[in-house]
């Protein structure tokens, strides 16, 4: 029997002041390099298309092989009233989320809402892959390495991210998360793995299996680690 689809958040938050100091052209070029590099991680991430009015139209605007499509989308979306705003929405060409259908959203700005890179819905990768955690870690590692402006990253069930956190006004480390500080195993003994990212911080993997917010051990471990991060002064407010 096929397991029901479960929605997951995969959000990498920008420091707004830092990302808006990067020129639009540099950001677009970096997005293109990033999408190209994702293809080396898994075939599901090998092609990315602009959103279109129909499936046929969308499939005409692949951006990895045709960087000009990405550049045109960025130019079309420019608004003189909001010069720091850069928004790009792409899709990996898979229609069925259960087979890995995924969107990539890029929101760089200094507005009141969160500025971030998102994969929507990351539950698609959880559903489609036998070992999604390994790929998600590599996607997160690639992101924080390529974007020094990312100041937090989290992968967690959507229900937990929106309603289940211990600190409703703060971020969470989730199932897999990035903290821009060096974390010590002695402070997080229940974490499955702490991955040092030189000159950037630490990726924390809390457990090998996919996080289930209904699992009491999962809930306890993430809550305990979020509490420790608050004690260390490392768990940021929900928005910056």
Predicted segments with their positions:
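N-terminal low-complexity, intrinsically disordered segments
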Residues: 26-101
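Short low-complexity stretches enriched in small and charged residues
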Residues: 70-76, 107-109, 128, 159-162
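Residues in well-ordered beta-strands of folded domains
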Residues: 89-91, 103-105, 118-120, 176-178, ...
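Short helix-loop boundary/capping segments
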Residues: 114-174
